[in-house]
């Protein structure tokens, strides 16, 4: 079986040096630089415990950081590779406080396997996963569900970014031809009832958007190379935005390209769950403690209430399934 690497991005939002640099590049209008995008929930150790316990087969872990690392992290571990932004990103893109810029350059990480899984630091493994949960027959496992794009927050640029992702693939691919060529994957029973969304979206001439799971994403490096080759000017422009903007595309454009090319294996959408802290607190604690799925995303939000209280409660839930330190911790 091919080697599979994990890539994890992390920022210590309390680092005074990082904060000082960030203040030098105050975001302009149309950017998103809210505090909740950078604050540390002090739960990263549970990410590593989850990997050691539930994905011991992983080849390497590329820990992508501005430069800081947690004091407790065992950087001498044979599976850990610390990667600073300047190690793989062009000088013209640095310094960056834009996760989209970082995500779009992951394929440039030295030594990264062709098959890799990308994690944000709010995504955790909470039960056993197999390589086949991420790749089958050499292709990423994914849930390709077309959906209508809606927005309920005029100040959140995320919907704009998703629209940009879809626009870019629509410039290169004909929807009717793509679906005809990939019909078995487009209407796979693996999607359950959600496959009917693909049926309902058939009358529309172009792709609107796709269901986003906010869960670990498997990628082929070859996809990144192809998109950069075909739309390098657009990606270069995005990567020069130091903060996230409404004009960006993100890593989902790589997912969409894999859909268009048929380079994916249909997968059930029930593999993991996405929750927002402060909105789904009961579900969060139940899911973690009962290990109700294989992976979970804990989305930060400005309206979490008492931050310190929420942080401690989440830590207590993780301690139920991860009471012991991993070999990634000193």
Report the location of each language-model feature.
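ER/Golgi luminal nucleotide-sugar-dependent glycosyltransferases, focusing on the catalytic module
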Residues: 1-117, 124-330
């Amino acid at each position: 079986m091919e080697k599979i690497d994990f890539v994890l991005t992390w920022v210590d939002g309390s680092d005074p040096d990082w904060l000082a640099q960030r203040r030098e590049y105050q975001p302009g209008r149309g950017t998103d630089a809210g505090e909740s995008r950078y604050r540390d929930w002090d739960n990263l150790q549970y990410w590593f415990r989850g990997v050691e316990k539930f994905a011991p087969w992983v080849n390497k872990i590329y820990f992508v950081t501005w430069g800081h690392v947690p004091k407790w992290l065992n950087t001498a571990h044979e599976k850990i590779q610390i990667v600073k932004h300047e190690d793989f990103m062009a000088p013209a893109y640095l310094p960056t406080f834009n996760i989209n810029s970082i995500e779009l350059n992951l394929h440039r990480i030295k030594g990264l396997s062709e098959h890799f899984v990308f994690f944000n630091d709010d995504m955790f493994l909470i039960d056993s996963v197999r390589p086949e949960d991420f790749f089958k027959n050499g292709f990423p496992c994914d849930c390709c569900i077309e959906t209508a794009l809606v927005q309920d927050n005029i100040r959140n640029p995320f919907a704009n970014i998703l629209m940009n992702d879809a626009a870019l693939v629509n410039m290169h691919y004909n929807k009717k031809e793509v679906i005809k060529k990939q019909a078995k994957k487009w209407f796979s029973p693996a999607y359950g009832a959600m496959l009917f969304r693909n049926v309902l979206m058939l009358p529309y001439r172009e792709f609107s958007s796709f269901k986003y799971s906010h869960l670990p994403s498997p990628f082929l490096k070859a996809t990144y190379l192809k998109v950069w080759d075909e739309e390098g000017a657009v990606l270069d422009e995005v990567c020069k935005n130091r903060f996230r903007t409404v004009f960006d595309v993100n890593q989902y454009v790589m997912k969409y390209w894999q859909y268009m090319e048929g380079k994916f294996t249909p997968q059930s959408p029930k593999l993991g769950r996405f929750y927002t802290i402060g909105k789904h607190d009961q579900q969060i604690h139940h899911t973690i403690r009962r290990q109700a799925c294989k992976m979970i995303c804990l989305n930060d939000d400005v309206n979490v209430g008492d931050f310190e209280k929420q942080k401690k409660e989440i830590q207590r839930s993780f301690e139920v399934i991860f009471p012991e330190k991993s070999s990634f911790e000193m």
